[in-house]
């Protein structure tokens, strides 16, 4: 019945059922289209299904999950095209949202490189094009392949489609170019071309695209390159991946060479030597935004000197030498009708505002996040208030402020619950012993006895970036968990044995929605996932503060589950803790979360049962023959040739583990002038001590 109702007429229970039905149906059509090239319905009918699913998720954001079809677009390669592994990963950028963030970015560069305040830090500024990232690999001047960004490590092979763009040459003009050069940039569609395309779509009885970015992405990813050739796509070059020799000494110089190669480059790009100059360029580009003729959503800043970029390196998900300064979000005014509390997989109680529907940036918004208890109290948000909401890009809308907080007849202040609305356990705000402050998030203390936490953790466990078990989606996880068939991850891998032993009644293959074939396929998918990489396994555990990037750092550092487990289970040991905190990109929050997780006996038991079902692959060995790969290094004293942060990042890039204190596990102590107690302890323990010059001789720098 819910399938016949408009989304705004659905109850939450009806919406949940309809969401599950749509997700299942769309997944089936995706498989038919992308894997079998045999679509069962028209594009218009498919788009209608997706539009309804998206509308439900706008109204009920608690249904949004990594498993939802709406969350899979633009991530891992779809299977529609061949895959290309990027020689150099295509990473994302960190964000700046105000002037202070930009000043902090420049300050971080200065501190990392050990520059004086009087030293000039030159930074480029250029428009952030709102399109689809692509990487073009040229060998001997010939385009050999082109790929989308994908998940940053692997993209889709869209070479033939990219060759249809007039802005992309199949052969570079004569010139002194590197033999191998990967040109990276953005595929986009101008406003005028977008309007003309939508007119043609409507005339042909097809749905119009929502915005130029979606149109560009959809056009580039057509199965038939002839279809792409009929779409007015453009390209701006602004970055590079693998190159066999340097393009230039500077960012500005490298981009200028792209222009010489025949690629369009953005003429608004500028080089600045002060924060004030950067902000002036930002405001100038923002003022020109409406008249540019194409979509931009901010300004990108990059350290101009390429030797500085190399020294600055990367953190887990982004370069230290670049940042995106986003434009302010679009805003609108509406009525806050109710405040609901959602419980996430880590027990966080998140308040959600239910709003009178309002259009913001072309999207109808009915829900917005209120973040936490402190935010509600600070902004004095109450049910019935007229509020300003804002939406930036694909970020969940948020309530900015109350329009008239002094109006007569306002409702009562919101009473934030101190008990979990799902399981009734106490919901507490943890006390941070170091800051002396309460955590801003109130969390359910029920752990896995809380149905909401258990369900969300199980859904995370099988999600795309974790175990990625095909056929075990939202509906199945919810049904199996509610029935008690799967109440911990290990139960997934015993499901087949229990079903065959007659412990599950009625048997799964005899249940509505299942059959012999679907159950056989499900069991095959589960068996295929018994072997998993260490990084995916750690991410799948859903430990607070240990997400995808942190898991990858741990995997790269420790190499094996045995080594990681030995460290995580012994964080009360100061040397073990110091070694983990010495990993570039790992902070106190992740270490404390791990210590708390491994302290709990039921978590250790759960892990033992799970690991017994799996083969956890060791992380790939670091691809170099560095003499310090796998060694533990400690730096002390005043280094003269580079800063401490820079030395640490360099050592880790060579495969070394950097610790903060000397122990029996330390292989080298690199001691600069002023080395004190660490040098003494190293001598007592027989740890080899190197001068800074000896260290550079060792690593060949």
Swiss-Prot record:
Any one annotated GO CC term: cytosol
Q: Which reaction does it catalyse?
A: NAD(+) + (deoxyribonucleotide)n-3'-hydroxyl + 5'-phospho-(deoxyribonucleotide)m = (deoxyribonucleotide)n+m + AMP + beta-nicotinamide D-nucleotide
Keyword line: DNA damage, DNA repair, DNA replication, Ligase, Magnesium, Manganese, Metal-binding, NAD, Zinc
Ranges where the BRCT domain occurs: 623-701
Q: What class of enzyme is it?
A: ligase
- Which top-rank group of organisms is this from? Bacteria
Catalytic residues per the record? 128
Chain positions recorded as NAD(+) binding sites: 43-47, 92-93, 126, 149, 186, 302, 326
Q: Which residues form a coiled coil?
A: none
Pfam families, sorted: BRCT, DNA_ligase_aden, DNA_ligase_OB, DNA_ligase_ZBD, HHH_2
**What EC number(s) does this enzyme carry?**
6.5.1.2
The processes (GO biological process) annotated in the record are: DNA repair; DNA replication
Q: Which family does it belong to?
A: Belongs to the NAD-dependent DNA ligase family. LigA subfamily.
What does this chain do?
Answer: DNA ligase that catalyzes the formation of phosphodiester linkages between 5'-phosphoryl and 3'-hydroxyl groups in double-stranded DNA using NAD as a coenzyme and as the energy source for the reaction. It is essential for DNA replication and repair of damaged DNA.
What protein is this chain from? DNA ligase
Q: Which organism is it from?
A: Maricaulis maris (strain MCS10) (Caulobacter maris)
């Amino acid at each position: 019945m819910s399938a016949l109702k408009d989304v705004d007429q659905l109850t939450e229970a009806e919406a949940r059922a309809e969401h599950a039905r749509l997700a299942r149906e769309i997944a089936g059509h995706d498989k038919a289209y992308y894997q079998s090239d045999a679509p069962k319905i028209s594009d218009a009918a498919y788009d209608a299904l997706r539009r309804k699913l998206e509308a439900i998720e706008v109204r009920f954001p608690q249904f949004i999950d990594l498993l939802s079809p709406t969350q899979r677009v633009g991530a891992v390669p779809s299977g529609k095209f061949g895959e290309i592994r990027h020689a150099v990963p295509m990473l994302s950028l960190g964000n700046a949202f105000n002037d202070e963030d930009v000043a902090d970015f420049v300050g971080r560069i200065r501190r990392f490189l050990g520059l004086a305040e009087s030293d000039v830090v030159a930074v480029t500024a250029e428009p952030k094009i709102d399109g689809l990232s692509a990487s073009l690999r040229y060998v001997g001047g010939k385009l050999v392949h082109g790929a989308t960004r994908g998940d940053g490590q692997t993209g889709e092979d869209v070479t033939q489609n990219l060759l249809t763009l007039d802005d992309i040459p199949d052969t570079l003009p004569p010139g002194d170019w590197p033999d191998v050069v990967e040109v990276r940039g953005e595929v986009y569609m101008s406003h005028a071309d977008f309007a003309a395309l939508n007119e043609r779509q409507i005339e042909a009885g097809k749905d119009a695209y929502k915005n130029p970015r979606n149109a560009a992405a959809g056009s580039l990813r057509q199965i038939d390159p002839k279809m792409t050739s009929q779409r007015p796509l453009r390209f701006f070059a602004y970055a590079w991946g693998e190159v066999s020799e340097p393009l230039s000494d500077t960012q500005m110089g490298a981009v200028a060479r792209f222009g010489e190669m025949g690629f369009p480059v953005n003429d608004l790009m500028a080089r600045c030597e002060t924060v004030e100059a950067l902000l002036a360029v930002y405001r100038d580009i923002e003022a020109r935004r409406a008249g540019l003729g194409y979509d931009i959503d901010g300004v990108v800043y990059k350290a101009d000197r390429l030797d500085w970029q190399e020294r600055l390196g990367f953190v887990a998900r982004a370069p230290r030498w670049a940042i995106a300064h986003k434009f302010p979000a679009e805003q609108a005014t509406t009525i806050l009708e109710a405040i609901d509390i959602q419980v996430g997989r880590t027990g966080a109680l998140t308040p959600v505002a239910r709003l009178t529907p309002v259009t913001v940036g072309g999207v109808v918004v009915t829900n917005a996040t209120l973040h936490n208890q402190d935010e509600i109290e600070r902004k004095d948000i109450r049910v019935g208030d007229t509020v300003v909401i804002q939406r930036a890009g694909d970020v969940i809308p948020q309530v900015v402020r109350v329009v008239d907080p002094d109006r007569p007849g306002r409702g009562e202040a919101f009473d934030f619950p101190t008990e979990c609305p799902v399981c009734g356990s106490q919901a507490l705000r943890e006390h941070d012993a170091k800051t002396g402050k309460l955590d801003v998030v109130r969390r359910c203390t029920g752990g896995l006895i809380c149905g909401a936490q258990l369900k969300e953790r199980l859904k995370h466990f099988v999600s795309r970036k974790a175990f990625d078990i095909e056929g075990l989606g939202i509906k199945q996880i919810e049904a199996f968990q509610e029935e008690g068939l799967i109440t911990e991850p290990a139960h997934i891998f015993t499901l087949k044995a229990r079903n065959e032993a007659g412990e599950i009644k009625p048997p799964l293959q005899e249940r509505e929605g299942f059959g012999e074939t679907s159950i056989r396929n499900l069991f095959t998918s589960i068996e295929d996932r018994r072997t998993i990489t260490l990084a995916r396994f750690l991410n799948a555990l859903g430990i607070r503060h240990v997400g995808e990037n942190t898991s990858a750092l741990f995997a790269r550092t420790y190499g094996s589950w045995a080594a990681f487990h030995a460290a995580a289970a012994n964080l009360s040991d100061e040397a073990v803790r110091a070694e983990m905190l010495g990993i570039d990109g790992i902070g106190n929050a992740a270490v404390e979360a791990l210590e708390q997780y491994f302290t709990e006996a039921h978590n250790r038991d759960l892990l033992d049962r799970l690991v017994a079902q799996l083969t956890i692959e060791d992380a790939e060995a670091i691809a170099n023959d560095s003499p310090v790969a796998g060694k533990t290094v400690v730096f002390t004293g005043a280094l003269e040739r580079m800063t401490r942060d820079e030395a640490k990042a360099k050592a880790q890039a060579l495969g070394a583990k950097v610790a903060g204190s000397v122990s029996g596990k330390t292989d080298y102590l690199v001691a600069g002038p002023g080395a004190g107690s660490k040098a003494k302890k190293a001598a007592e323990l027989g740890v080899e001590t190197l001068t800074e010059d000896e260290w550079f001789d060792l690593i060949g720098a």
